[in-house]
Amino acid sequence: MLVIILGVIGLLANQVLGLPTQAGGHLRSTDNPPQEELGYWCTYMESCKFCWECAHGICKNKVNESMPLIIENSYLTSCEVSRWYNQCTYSEGNGHYHVMDCSDPVPHNRPHRLLMKIYEKEDL
């Protein structure tokens, strides 16, 4: 009972102080962000595996229709993303992190694009 009361007080305090709630503001580290947030996460780190739908070694970007089909290769990274207040973090799982201000995001696509192999029909 005490936990419920403290939870309600915490939510009310967040609303009064203008802080984001757990559902709307914070995101625990995950490799599967909410579908409605893919547009944000996949814009600033498009090499994350959760941004792509792959079948038979050919991948299509889930968010950006203008991205070419690619061959599933080392370009795709197993990312985990998290958000705490206004700090958004991408973890690439190999000790590399990209941290940015969520309201002033900075893309981190260039280093990974060098490894992208675009699908050509001759690749079949």
Swiss-Prot record:
Which Cys pairs does UniProt list as disulfide-bonded? none
Cross-referenced InterPro entries: ASFV_fam_110
Key words, A-Z: Early protein, Signal
In the record, which residues are listed under signal peptide? 1-28
Question: What is the similarity comment for this entry?
Answer: Belongs to the asfivirus MGF 110 family.
- UniProt function note: Plays a role in virus cell tropism, and may be required for efficient virus replication in macrophages.
Q: Provide the protein name.
A: Protein MGF 110-5L
Q: What species is this protein from?
A: African swine fever virus (isolate Pig/Portugal/OURT88/1988)
